[in-house]
C-alpha cells in the first residue's frame, strides 16, 4: 500500500451495490484515515472529484464499477482496485502496473463476463496482482477492503 494514499474513489455496481451499500463494505477505521468518495457505476470521474492527484489517489470499482476504473486507469495512481469487476476484451491489452490489485471469482459471472480471466492474466503479466477467490459476488468487496487496507 502506498503510504501517500489519501483519497479513495469507489464506484459501486448494479442493483444492490449502491453507494449506500458500498459504504457498509468499507471498514469503519478507513473513514477517519482517507477522504472517500463513493459513486454509482457510470459516474464520470470528473463529476466525483474535479482535482485528483494520482500520486495520492486510489480508484476502486466493484462489479459494473470496474469498467469505470478500467476506463480511467493510469499507472500513476497510487492504488487501483478491481473487485470482481465487469470487464471488456480491450482491457486484456492494458499495460497495468504494480499499483493494480484484482480479486475475482469467475464462477460468479458465467458467460456474461468472458474477458474476466484474460484481464486477470494481463494484470499479473504487466506487474499487478490478481487473485481468484471462491466467494459469493456480494461478499468480495468487504473481503477486498479488509485484505488490501490495514490499520
Stretches found by the model and what they are:
Residues 109-151:
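C-terminal catalytic histidine-bearing segment of alpha/beta-hydrolase fold enzymes
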Residues 44-56:
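Conserved acidic catalytic loop of the alpha/beta-hydrolase fold
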Residues 58, 79-81:
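Residue in the alpha/beta-hydrolase core beta-strand immediately N-terminal to the catalytic nucleophile
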Residues 30-43:
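Conserved alpha/beta-hydrolase
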Residues 13, 41, 81-89, 105-108:
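Active-site nucleophile loop of the alpha/beta-hydrolase fold
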Residues 1-33:
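Short, surface-exposed "cap/lid" segments of acyl-processing enzymes
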Residues 60-69:
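Gly/Ala-rich beta-loop-alpha elbow adjacent to hydrolase catalytic centers
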Residues 97-105:
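Catalytic His-Asp charge-relay segment
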Amino acid at each position: 500500500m502506498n503510504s501517500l494514499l489519501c483519497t479513495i474513489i469507489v464506484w459501486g455496481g448494479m442493483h444492490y451495490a449502491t453507494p449506500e451499500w458500498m459504504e457498509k463494505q468499507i471498514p469503519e477505521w478507513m473513514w477517519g484515515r482517507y477522504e472517500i468518495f463513493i459513486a454509482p457505476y457510470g459516474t464520470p470521474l470528473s463529476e466525483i472529484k474535479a482535482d485528483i492527484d494520482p500520486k495520492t489517489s486510489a480508484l476502486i470499482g466493484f462489479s459494473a464499477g470496474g469498467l469505470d476504473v478500467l476506463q480511467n486507469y493510469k499507472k500513476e495512481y497510487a492504488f487501483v482496485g478491481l473487485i470482481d469487476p465487469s470487464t471488456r476484451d480491450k482491457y486484456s491489452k492494458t499495460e497495468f502496473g504494480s499499483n493494480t490489485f484484482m480479486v475475482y471469482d469467475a464462477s460468479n459471472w458465467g458467460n456474461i463476463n468472458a474477458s474476466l480471466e484474460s484481464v486477470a492474466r494481463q494484470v499479473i503479466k504487466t506487474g499487478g496482482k490478481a487473485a481468484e477467490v471462491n466467494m459469493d459476488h456480494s461478499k468480495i468487496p468487504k473481503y477486498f477492503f479488509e485484505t488490501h487496507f490495514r490499520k
